[in-house]
Amino acid sequence: MKQSFYRYLMTQRDPNNYEPVAQFANNAFFDQSFPKHEGDYELLSQYLELNGSYLPSMLIFDEAYQLYQESEQA
């Protein structure tokens, strides 16, 4: 069963890690509106472009999404 992007992202959380993907995960955790059951790149990207003020660059999302896809293929 394919996990949602959010569920994958939560595996990257670490308050002591200042890497961009970890910080994205930490901030997404506090985003009450984050689409937690979504896995579609376009829908997630659109949400973050409109609501992800905590994300300094969409390149971070792209990197995290790439890691998510790789984890789903393993």
UniProtKB/Swiss-Prot annotation:
User: In which domain of life is the source organism classified?
Assistant: Bacteria
Name the InterPro entries for this protein: UPF0346, YozE_SAM-like, YozE_SAM-like_sf
Similarity comment: family membership: Belongs to the UPF0346 family.
- What HAMAP family does this protein's entry cite? UPF0346
Protein name stated in the entry: UPF0346 protein LCA_0996
